[in-house]
Each structure stands twice: as structure tokens, then as C-alpha cells.
A protein has these predicted regions:
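A detector for short, charged/polar N-terminal pre-domain segments
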Residues: 1-11
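A basic, amphipathic helix-loop patch mediating RNA/tRNA/ribosome contacts
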Residues: 11-54
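C-terminal structural segments of small proteins and small subunits
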Residues: 47-72
Length: 72
């Protein structure tokens, strides 16, 4: 499981997928989410603007990412 550090919370799900290189663009990230290929905390998530906070676990295919807030 890979860790993702965010500088503030919440962050929209599609932005995390884009910035982590899972998707080449925001549009591609939204499409992946829309098609049910992404889960958050074990449940399929289809809301592109789902607010992600520290402690959330995102899964896409065989990749898992744990989100944590970066220290100040």
C-alpha cells in the first residue's frame, strides 16, 4: 500500500487520482470513477468530487493508496 500525503483536507477524489498518476488527466480520472473502477474505504465510489480526508484508503485495480495529512 502506497501512502499519499495531502497538504490540506478535504481533497476531491479525482484530483488525487490525477496527481498520483493513476489517470493522465482530470477527465480520465472522472471517467474511471464514473465507471465504478475506484473504491474508497472498501466501497465502490462513483462521486467524482467525493471529499477525501486523512485515513481514507483508495483502491484502483491492484493499487491501494492510504491518504494522510502532511505534517505542518
Amino acid at each position: 500500500m502506497r501512502e499519499i500525503e495531502i497538504s490540506r483536507e478535504p481533497v476531491e477524489l479525482y484530483k488525487i487520482l490525477k496527481f498520483e498518476g493513476v489517470a493522465a488527466s482530470g477527465g480520465e480520472a472522472k471517467s474511471l470513477i464514473d465507471s465504478g473502477q475506484v473504491s474508497v474505504n472498501g466501497a465502490v465510489e462513483t462521486r467524482k468530487r467525493k471529499k477525501i480526508v486523512s485515513g481514507d484508503v483508495i483502491r484502483f485495480k491492484d493499487e491501494e493508496f492510504k491518504v494522510r495529512l502532511a505534517p505542518l
